[in-house]
UniProtKB/Swiss-Prot annotation:
Its main location: membrane. It is found in: Cell membrane. Belongs to the cation transport ATPase (P-type) (TC 3.A.3) family. Type IB subfamily. Mg(2+) binds at residues 617, 621. A metal cation binds at residues 20, 23. GO terms for cellular component: membrane; plasma membrane. GO terms for molecular function: ATP binding; ATP hydrolysis activity; copper ion binding; P-type divalent copper transporter activity. It is an enzyme of class 7 (translocase). This is Probable cation-transporting ATPase HI_0290. The lineage of its organism: Bacteria, Pseudomonadati, Pseudomonadota, Gammaproteobacteria, Pasteurellales. Residues 9-75 form the HMA domain. The keyword Coiled coil does not apply. It catalyses: ATP + H2O = ADP + phosphate + H(+).
Length: 722
């Protein structure tokens, strides 16, 4: 793990001009050689670099200049900027290129049909091929020259070397052997290879944009204009003119523009893009609204508390952008292959030429075979295999309400075989409720009195048990008297004076002098008992329990169906933890654990070879979250828990954890498929080209299709159901 210093600064840089993974490797290598760069990673699919550097030794401008000198355009990525911008230079260049390709294509089809009359005269072929090589193919040459200057080779080197070689050979035959030129010029190959490769890059860029549409969808959730109250009048203004604290109105069909609190009105809001919850949520005065939510019914007037990047929506976009720009460990394999891929292909091409010439004594066939090898080899498919799937998978996760911190966290999640869950707030609601009440048979006071007296004392405290008792009394519409606070004994209870009643104690049974009756012993095993006494005479007791969340059982069943071991680790009484575990069908449950105990138990599981995911809620879960291979925090968790976690669950539901595991596994499977396709394509394609089974034109078309097929396979993740 990278050790950051106070001087460390992390920036995201948008890069233009990369044509394959070799380009990304080259930039990464150059940046990491600089002494002030602590870490640099370049994502070819997202066309983005993430750089951590010492801000006392270098500036952002210097980092950008380094990339410029490497031969690529670059700029600091702005907040909410999409990773890949439209490239308007591709369409017109592609149109002209394919207009030139048409006569060559007609001639090729004629030759297949046995007619040579449709072929252009050699001099016309030379003229059109020259336009392509000297003008339309300039981006390939520029990329190749820049790559060679940087000490590396990329796809541009292969394409430009192959097409230029066959173009120069054909020109030589035309001008020095004009009488035999018609049968020995291959201008159509140099033209059509550039055409197919350019078309493939265009389609590849479009497909990459589709793989990133989760980010663009989030960006589109923000309304362009909003209605605000100024000088007692409602006016419509641009969102960027809104100030924090202003009153905003959102009617049915409009989106919320800022995170805020409802001042008046009520309605229903669809927050599915933000939390993964498919059903609209009712909103009333005093409730919170989130930027990007759609008002499906009613009208809401709210006060803006956070705007832009400070909103939950802004956090989501920044988190998704950072994660999509990161690299998964499995990408290292592709990086290693692509770093040596082009040099190896160049050697294979030269060997192909030499062996073919030795065996056939035919320079033309030797040249065609060598060029076919250069053209069919495709490092792009390998380079796209991992990041394309990661970007789609991360977008899918965000739509399901799961934020992965980076690609590495998603990959590690795919390997999880054991899930450790905290009890309170994770499996249970974390809200204590009075489940039973006891009073002696000779009770002097009524049940309502018991509630009133207990609430009068507990109203002065601020812990979950106190809140549960006060809320229960208020729900019964009881008038709660005012007690004079006397003293609190930590871990025991509270004592207060109530006029005309006496000294009231509320707390543990022994603190109030209560010996538990036999009929309460069973409840004690699964509940917290709070006794009440007046003048040291017990008058009753409450049993408070934390109820299971409605979806906890379903979530545990889904985990077990995926052959994942489930373990509960809690600081609560062992009997209470066992009771919850029995309800959920969980065999392993540990109670009375301190935060350090939880971390040690997780380490023991890891030592046994398990890949452990921990799900927790609260500061006391932070050590355990840090100890696990992968950690998930609930969105309402403490800041410490969220900072420690590998991912965040937006719905506060274990079911979202199951969704995260499913998406991560599907993404890893997709990556392996992509790598297999890319490797098989090159393993089969290069020998076929070397032995003359593929012409340069077919090889160029196959090369273009290889990258597109990998991207299309990655896009299948969008349709995965769970």
């Amino acid at each position: 793990m990278l050790d950051l210093t106070p001087q460390s600064k992390k920036i995201s840089i948008q890069i233009g001009g990369m044509t394959c993974q070799s380009c990304a490797n080259r930039i990464e290598k150059v940046l990491n050689k600089k002494p002030f760069v602590q870490q640099a990673g370049v994502n070819f699919a997202a066309e983005e670099a993430q750089v951590v550097f010492d801000a006392t030794q270098a500036s952002e401008a210097q980092i950008i200049e380094i990339i410029h000198k490497t031969g690529f355009s670059a700029h600091i990525k702005q907040a909410n900027e999409l990773p890949i911008e439209e490239n308007t230079s591709i369409p017109w260049r592609l149109i002209v290129l394919w207009i030139i390709n048409i006569p060559f294509l007609i001639g090729m089809l004629g030759m297949i049909g046995g007619s040579h009359n449709l072929m252009l005269p050699p001099i016309w072929q030379f003229a059109l091929a020259s336009i392509v090589q000297l003008w339309l193919a300039i981006p390939f040459y520029r990329g190749a020259i820049g790559s060679i200057r940087g000490g590396l080779t990329n796809m541009d080197v292969l394409v430009s070397t192959g097409t230029l070689t066959i173009y120069l050979y054909s020109a030589f035959m035309l001008f020095y052997h004009a009488n035999h030129a018609m049968g020995h010029v291959y201008f159509e190959a140099s033209v059509m290879v550039i055409g197919f490769v350019s078309l493939g890059k265009f389609l590849e860029d479009r497909t990459k944009k589709h793989s990133l549409n989760s980010l663009s969808m989030l960006l589109q959730l923000t309304p362009k204009k909003v209605t605000v109250l100024r000088n007692e009048k409602w006016i419509e203004i641009a969102l960027d003119q809104v100030n924090i604290g202003e009153i905003i109105r959102a009617n049915q069909g409009e989106r919320i523009a800022a995170d805020g609190v409802i001042e008046s009105g009520n309605g229903w809001c669809d927050e599915s893009h933000l939390t993964g919850e498919s059903r609209p949520e009712e909103k009333q005065k005093g409730g919170k609204v989130l930027a990007g939510a759609m008002v499906t019914e009613g009208s809401i007037i709210y006060r803006a508390n956070q705007l832009g990047s400070q909103t939950l929506l802004g956090d989501m976009m920044n988190a998704l952008s950072d994660a999509q720009g990161s690299k998964a460990p499995i990408a290292r394999f592709a990086d290693k292959v692509t770093s040596v891929f082009v040099p190896v292909v160049l050697v294979i091409s030269l060997v192909t030429f030499a062996l073919t010439y030795i065996l056939t004594n035919d320079s033309v066939s030797s040249l065609i075979h060598a060029v076919s090898v250069l053209v069919i080899a495709c490092p792009c498919a390998l380079g796209l295999a991992t990041p394309a799937a990661i970007m789609v998978g991360l977008g899918k996760a965000v739509n399901a309400g799961v934020w992965f911190k980076d690609a590495a966290a998603m990959e590690e999640t795919a390997h999880v075989d054991t899930v450790v869950l905290d009890k309170t707030g994770t499996l249970t609601k974390g809200e204590l409720e009075i489940s039973a009440l006891w009073q002696p048979q000779s009770a002097v006071y009524s049940e309502d009195d018991l509630y009133r007296f207990a609430a009068a004392v507990e109203r002065q405290a601020n812990h979950p048990i106190a809140k549960a008792i006060v809320q229960a009394a208020e729900x019964k519409m009881l008038e709660i008297p005012t007690a004079l606070f006397s003293k609190m004994e930590v871990g025991q209870g509270i004592q207060a004076e109530l006029e005309q009643v006496g000294t009231i104690k509320v707390g543990k049974p022994d603190y109030c002098g209560l010996i538990l009756p036999k009929n309460l012993e069973d409840i004690w095993q699964i509940a917290s008992i709070v006794a009440v006494s007046i003048n040291d005479e017990p008058i009753g007791a409450f049993a408070l329990t934390d109820t299971l969340k409605n979806d906890s059982l379903h979530a545990i069943q889904r985990l077990q169906q995926q052959n994942i071991d489930v373990v509960i680790m809690s600081g609560d009484q062992q009997s209470v933890v066992d009771y919850i575990a029995k309800q959920l069908g969980i065999k392993k449950a540990f109670g009375k654990l301190t935060p350090r105990d939880k971390a040690e138990q997780i380490q023991k599981l890891k030592d046994l070879g398990h890949i452990v995911a921990m799900v927790g809620d609260g500061i006391n879960d932070a050590p355990a979250l840090a100890s696990a291979n992968v950690s998930f925090a609930m969105k309402s968790s403490s800041d410490i828990a969220e900072q420690t976690a590998s991912a965040t669950l937006m719905q506060h539901s274990v079911n979202q954890l199951v969704d995260a595991l499913f998406i991560a596994r599907a993404t890893l499977k997709n990556i392996k498929q992509n790598l297999f396709f890319a490797l098989i394509y090159n393993i089969l394609g290069i020998p076929l080209a070397a032995f003359g089974f593929l012409s340069p034109i077919i090889a160029g078309a196959a090369m273009a299709l290889s990258s597109i097929s990998v991207l299309m396979n990655a896009l299948r993740l969008k349709k995965v159901r769970f």
